[in-house]
Amino acid sequence: MVMSLQAQNTILDSSVHRTTSGSSLQSMIFNNYPPKHEVRAVWLTTIGGIDWPHSYAQSAYSAEKQKQELVEILNRLQKAHINTVLIQTRVRGTMIYPSAYEPWDGCLSGFPGKSPGYDALKFAIEECHKRGMECHAWVVTIPVGKWNALGCKSLRSRFPGLIRKIGPDGYMNPEDNRTADYLAQICSEITRNYDVDGIHLDYIRYPETWNIKVSREKGRQFITRIVEAIHRSVKREKPWVKMSCSPIGKFDDLGRYWSHGWNAYTKVCQDAQGWLKSGLMDELYPMMYFRNEQFFPFAIDWAEQSHGKIVVPGLGIYFLDPKEGKWKIGDITSEMYHLRNIGLGHAFFRNKFLLDNRQGIYDFTSKEFNLYPSLVPAMTWESRRIPVAPSHLKTQQLGGKVVLTWNNTAQYEDGTAVSTPYIYNNVYASRTYPVDTEDARNLISARMMGNQITLDLSGDENPLFFAVTAMDGYGNESRPVQNVAKVEDLLQERQGKAKKLKCSDGRLFLPESAKNADATCFLVESLLGQPLKVLRSSSNYLNISSLSEGVYVLKSLNKKGVSHTFGTFYIRKNKKS
């Protein structure tokens, strides 16, 4: 992997832009400082090729062209620091991969039931992972398409009485036990055969036109039974695979705000908040395609009822298209800031409207809102074990580039083997040492695979120090390995054989040369020569308790403005230097 740091605009001098771990969400928003952990997702719709593909794969050449379309889409999503792609996998009783249960969808080859000559789901997953993005299989559950279309006809033939006709369309009966069993088999097949990061259930509810004859409580039990069956089948295969769904954007009526009769819990029997509480869902993507009082209080309700899980409201950016609605860009950006302020992620519906840059939404996302990469929050409710940190972090200068290499150990700190198939790595860079891996602005590469990265160091504001962490499939991150050798090199280069000064318990002990110097005060600098703090002393030590962990240079200043360098000192947390 080769990455241009300057082009990504990811490196700032964190000695100037540092924020403590205790910073409030409001201060981070005020400073346009994004959080380190945040889901930034997009729905990639394949039905009819409305997001992708835009051409059919009917030959080797056209298949490659179709693949390249997806590559270009993912490249642009990566530049906007999108970290999760929800790709429509089960379309309408049809698939974008070779399934033992259902036929090919026609969006790929142009002919329902015909292979495009490659496995589109496998290709999408691989390309997402190359870019550090999660790839979730979006499974449309209850609707199975037009009554006489291939997917619906196939299911009607195999399961007599299972499919109900409403208007021109067919729907799986949520009250029939076979629906839960069948959908669980499909999701198990996907989870077992693919390195998918999540199973994303769409339309896991009663159709709004369904004549529900049972009580609403009984209806919720029927829908939850389907969710339970799918959850068991997925977690049995791979417990690190995320379970998510896209419920109606308003869970239910609130005390002061009415849902206008369109809500998840009462109208269509989705107990989505209950699924979070019981552990059936790891993530929710509520479809919050609303504005103003129909958005903000309901978003707060989702946040308050998250039960420690991940909530990523979907934003209706399609309304920015004048053919779809009369929304303004400010309607969406205010919602994005609100979601970040209450600790929620954001998901765009849908990909085309983001990449078409409707009213500047792509520019805002990539150049203002998501300035830095982010990590998906860890599934600590599934596992809290911490991987062993990488080791032997080395740098090699090659012209205007630097190559970082390191070693990974597929073990947790408790000595057990890592239970997920991959160890991912996150790479950080900064102009101060040690690199603060809790500062999102220092994250330059997230969730990368492999143990090497090449960085383009063209430009004047390049980092001098690097850190790498390991991360398992649950998202649990290790302690960092720091590029200590680089610090030593810089010390020797800048100070020659400068004396190492002793510090302990917030005190820096002055050398004899300092006691005898005609100094009115002392200056603390960074290794790059940036003045950080002026200190005065009436004894044999200086109070340095206000300085953060790092490496510093101590100088004297006299009345004539003459400066003398005494040496360097390290401050290490919980250690004496």
Per-region residue spans from a language model:
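Catalytic domains of carbohydrate-active enzymes, especially glycoside hydrolases
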Residues: 68-94, 193-196
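C-terminal tail/sorting-segment detector
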Residues: 490-495, 509-512, 549-577
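Beta-strand-rich modules
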Residues: 457-477
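Aromatic-lined carbohydrate-binding/catalytic grooves of carbohydrate-active enzymes
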Residues: 80-116
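Pro/Thr/Ser/Gly-rich low-complexity, intrinsically disordered linker/stalk tracts
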Residues: 364-417, 475-490
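Aromatic-lined carbohydrate-recognition surfaces of secreted/lumenal glycan-active proteins
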Residues: 134-146, 200, 219-265, 311-314, ...
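Substrate-binding cleft of secreted/luminal carbohydrate-active enzymes
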Residues: 272-273, 277-295, 312-383
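Active-site-adjacent "subsite" loops/lids of carbohydrate-active enzymes
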Residues: 37-39, 43-67, 136-193
